[in-house]
């Protein structure tokens, strides 16, 4: 997708959680470092950053003459991503993804929640008055770690964003449903 869309640089990478389906592409970020000659900042919860720096040591520590390609940043609540004169303010909040805490992100009036099956009450406050809600919707049937179609609809009805984008749709959910 990077090649097809002619993406030449990355300002940052934000990780929602440490599962392999979210993190395994980290190795593919090396060309951005090689081209731009500067570390790529990554952001995530302390749990996620700990897993990434442990599982992908070569990205964060010098080894065998290779420079680290990434700079790890632990997020707790509000943080900023800076590039030249521009600043992107981001709010991180907890969501539940099965047996772990994952992270949802709020960018002004856009919320992104990729993998979750429950949103704690204290995190819900971030989801009102949204222009866009990007929300997990894996299947029609119940799932132990993801919202299903009915869970997603309940959340949409509760927070009433102007527009919603369902993500993580599995093969049993037709994209034209």
Question: How should these model regions be labeled?
Answer:
Residues 6-7, 27-31, 56-59, 105, ...:
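Short, glycine/charged-enriched secondary-structure capping and boundary segments
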Residues 1-44, 131-132:
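Active-site metal-binding motif and surrounding structural segment of the metallo-beta-lactamase
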Residues 14, 43, 73, 91, ...:
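Hydrophobic/aromatic beta-strand patches that form the interior of the parallel beta-sheet core
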Residues 12, 109-112, 132, 163:
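Structural motif
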Residues 2, 17, 42, 52, ...:
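Divalent metal-coordination and catalytic microenvironments
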């Amino acid at each position: 997708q990077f090649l097809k869309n002619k993406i030449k640089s990355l300002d940052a990478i934000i990780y929602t959680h440490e599962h392999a389906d979210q993190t395994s592409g980290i190795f593919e970020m090396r060309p951005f470092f090689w081209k731009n000659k500067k570390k790529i900042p990554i952001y995530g919860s302390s749990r996620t950053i700990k897993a990434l720096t442990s599982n992908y040591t070569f990205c964060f520590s010098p080894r065998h003459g290779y420079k680290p390609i990434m700079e790890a940043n632990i997020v707790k609540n509000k943080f900023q991503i800076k590039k030249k004169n521009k600043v992107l303010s981001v709010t991180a909040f907890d969501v539940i993804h099965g047996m772990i805490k994952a992270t949802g992100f709020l960018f002004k009036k856009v919320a992104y929640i990729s993998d979750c099956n429950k949103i704690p009450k204290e995190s819900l406050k971030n989801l009102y008055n949204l222009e866009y809600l990007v929300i997990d919707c894996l299947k029609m049937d119940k799932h132990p770690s993801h919202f299903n179609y009915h869970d997603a609809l309940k959340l949409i009805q509760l927070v009433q964003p102007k527009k919603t984008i369902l993500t993580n749709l599995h093969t049993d959910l037709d994209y034209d449903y």
